[in-house]
């Protein structure tokens, strides 16, 4: 798929089958960093093979961490108390799950580092995290526009003078980065570290993932709801020996959606009713839209209407603050709803791999949908009968745009996906797996 300028989607009628999900991106990159910071060796299984994880693995190797060869999703990492390499230039692509946590860890450890990424990464805000780290005395310099990468880290005097405050309304990754790095400083300073959240914390399920994984590596965080988090002075990461990565719940959303609009059943394995990922809640969104959703240990299955034969999903008006990535799938499903659909509280879309509100608005209109949008909301009215239009869908160098709009193949219009290779960020084989579930229209 890499290098293809476009992919013409076959007109789809039915979808059924089973998909073994690739590992979660959010969990994979968190576990890689935690394993590097922990005492002892950690064998990781089910690791996602993607651009973002390759960026993190390369950075850890560059920082002197002993990282084994990756084979069939398995890799062994020997933890270090502190990164052996104290001077480096790290290129981190467009991987927020690598850039933000590494910024915090490097800033609190000390050394001289330069962190950069692709042009879009340099448009994604990091100022709130930098402001919080400077409260610890970290020396961080913006090498371009203030508030954004690239960064130079070094030259500060790290200290703990009291609680550190971080803004929570832009990205939960800022709090995740501070939480993951804090045990290193707590133990070195001999002081408890408290992080206080300012404003409304978005994407709370991703913080739950962070706290869950920290606990598996031996660090329990005391918390006061969503307002304050305290890491004890004796906190220390310890490798669990072996760590299995769950399947990616955000990726599951596309396949579960196929079952909801293509009759089904479509079953995903690797996530289930016991998942630690918030995006499994997308299955409840599908149920509210009329899909039959079933759960088991390590699996979720959907059945639904056949939209290619005139079936329709129920329209929705919902707050998607807790599942912003899977919400993109819901926006595309609005093409097949029985009325206008409204997605609220999705302001975080503006600072993702692209401005996703603008991108979704633009591409849904190409297909004939009536679309309105604002700072943190999107409303989609399905195309009128006879109103569907053939479209070349721009993916905006955003893997989730490409995967979401694969669902448009169940409509009556011809759909071409531009730059389909952008799915390599999280799921290089997505379109092959997708095609294996479909029955084409005659």
Curated annotation (Swiss-Prot):
Compartment annotation: Cytoplasm
Chain residues that bind 3-phosphoshikimate: 25-26, 30, 171-173, 203, 325, 352
Example of a GO MF term: 3-phosphoshikimate 1-carboxyvinyltransferase activity
Positions of phosphoenolpyruvate binding: 25, 96, 124, 173, 356, 400, 425
UniProt keyword annotations, A-Z: Amino-acid biosynthesis, Aromatic amino acid biosynthesis, Cytoplasm, Transferase
Alphabetical list of NCBIfam families matching this protein: aroA
Record protein name field: 3-phosphoshikimate 1-carboxyvinyltransferase
Gene encoding the protein: aroA
């Amino acid at each position: 798929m890499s290098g293809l300028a476009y992919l013409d989607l076959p007109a789809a009628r039915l979808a059924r089958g089973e998909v073994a999900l690739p590992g979660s991106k959010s969990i994979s990159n968190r576990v890689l960093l935690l394993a590097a910071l922990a005492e002892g060796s950690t064998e990781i299984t089910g690791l996602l093979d993607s651009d973002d994880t390759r960026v993190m693995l390369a950075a850890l190797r560059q920082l002197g961490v002993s990282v084994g060869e990756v084979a069939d999703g398995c890799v062994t990492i020997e933890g270090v108390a502190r990164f052996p390499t104290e001077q480096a230039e790290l290129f981190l692509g467009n991987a927020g799950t690598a850039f933000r946590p590494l910024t915090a860890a490097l800033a609190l450890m000390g050394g001289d580092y330069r962190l950069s990424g692709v042009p879009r990464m340099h448009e994604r805000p990091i100022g709130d995290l930098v402001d919080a780290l400077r409260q610890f005395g970290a020396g961080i310099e913006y090498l371009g526009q203030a508030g954004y990468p690239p960064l130079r880290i070094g030259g500060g005097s790290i200290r703990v003078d009291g609680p550190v405050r971080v803004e929570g309304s832009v990205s939960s990754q800022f709090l995740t980065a501070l939480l993951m790095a804090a045990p290193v400083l707590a133990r070195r300073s001999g002081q408890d570290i408290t992080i206080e959240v300012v404003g409304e914390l978005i994407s709370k399920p991703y913080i739950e993932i962070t706290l869950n994984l920290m606990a598996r590596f031996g660090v329990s965080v005391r918390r006061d709801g969503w307002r304050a988090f305290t890491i004890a002075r004796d906190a220390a990461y310890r490798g669990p020996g072996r760590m299995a990565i769950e399947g990616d719940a955000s990726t599951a959303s596309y396949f579960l959606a196929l079952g909801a609009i293509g009759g089904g059943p479509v079953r995903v394995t690797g996530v289930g009713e016991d998942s630690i990922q918030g995006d499994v809640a997308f299955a409840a969104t599908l149920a509210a839209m009329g899909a039959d959703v079933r759960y088991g240990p390590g699996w979720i299955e959907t059945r639904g209407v056949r939209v290619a034969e005139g079936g329709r999903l129920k329209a929705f008006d919902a707050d998607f603050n807790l599942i912003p990535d899977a919400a993109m799938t819901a926006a595309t499903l609005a093409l097949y709803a029985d009325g206008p659909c409204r997605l609220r509280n999705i302001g975080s879309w503006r600072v993702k791999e692209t401005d996703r509100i603008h991108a979704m608005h633009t591409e849904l209109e190409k297909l004939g949908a009536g679309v309105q949008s604002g700072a943190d909301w999107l409303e989609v009215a399905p195309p009128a009968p006879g109103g569907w239009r053939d479209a070349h869908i721009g993916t905006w160098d955003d893997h989730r745009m490409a995967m979401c709009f694969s669902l448009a193949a169940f409509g009556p219009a011809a759909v071409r996906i531009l730059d389909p290779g952008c799915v390599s960020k999280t799921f290089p084989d997505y379109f092959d797996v997708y095609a294996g579930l479909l029955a084409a229209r005659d």
